[in-house]
């Protein structure tokens, strides 16, 4: 580890009050805790977020689908960096930050020797499925099964919306099959987890795997992943695993609060704004744990209330028709990725397809947006009430920050008073010395006689 990197990590962990916007995240965590092997300090919640985030990396042609020795995280990170440098291909979501993270992982005694096995990546437009998963052999007697969240593909986003009216989407079905396959291939206790849709898949797999596999799952991590329909969270299967599900959301969560949850949330402080708090790099860490808050923001509650009210008013058949109609319009661009939709030629294709939409589908889409608007308006009174309450009673971290500022002001006053007293004593001593010297000079002639 470079001294500059260590210094940066130390500054963030010890708290640089001059730069309150700089707080430690998963990068700093790797720099700060990376010298502690998992055998010495067992896997923690922050490790689980990091491994879940790494499932977004494009391991294609780097990690195989077999459950043999696999490839070390150090070697995988090196290859990812080489391919990115050579071909300018994307990594996970933020190339600049991802490169820093991968470089730190390569030097980390905690992570570099973790083995990657069983990598699968599947995008099927016909089945409207986007699914990817990888298993990490931790080297301390357990395996971490990580499910990837939504990627940049249009079909991946479509599958997310399908969750609002489907009892089971293809990725959830494959998550169950994958977890059971891991259990047969590896004779180790299991931890399953994921970020965003990956967290939903992890929870779903924990619910619906066979009894033998479920018995080996120690913990299920859901990092800001959406919930389920009411039938699923009321099911017997959910009750068999709910005590092992650990759900984490940022204070202004808008993704993790979607659909219905029955398990409690752990609220993590994020320095992101609004929906950008979904980015794992914005989650704040102190030492070996997240900085936790006691309450979500009014914006998060407003989004939660709005979406739930909208789903209750918009029946499943209408949801399907509206979502299928919008997807058909977007698919007219022939763009595979969401970013492709913003290219000029593709935008024109989308607009043309929207104009050609049949009357029934157009009515369903317009009704969906009308109900969404009315749901938002219906949630305004509650939002205003929560906002007023949050102004009257600040969140704990804000209170701590203001207390720290108050303490700093008091300390500054004490120091100023102490300096003033010291200065006054110094002036007094100087005055006394000068008076003594003057008196000595006056007496000098008399002594000479």
Each predicted region: which residue ranges?
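Alpha/beta hydrolase fold serine-hydrolase catalytic domain that processes acyl esters and thioesters
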Residues: 2-3, 10-46, 51-65, 70-133, ...
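Acidic, Ala/Val/Gly-enriched low-complexity intrinsically disordered segments
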Residues: 418, 436-437
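Gly/Ala-rich beta-loop-alpha elbow adjacent to hydrolase catalytic centers
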Residues: 193-198, 202
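Short glycine-enriched nucleophile-adjacent loop
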Residues: 202-211
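Intrinsic low-complexity repeat tracts in disordered regions, enriched in small/polar residues
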Residues: 414, 432-433
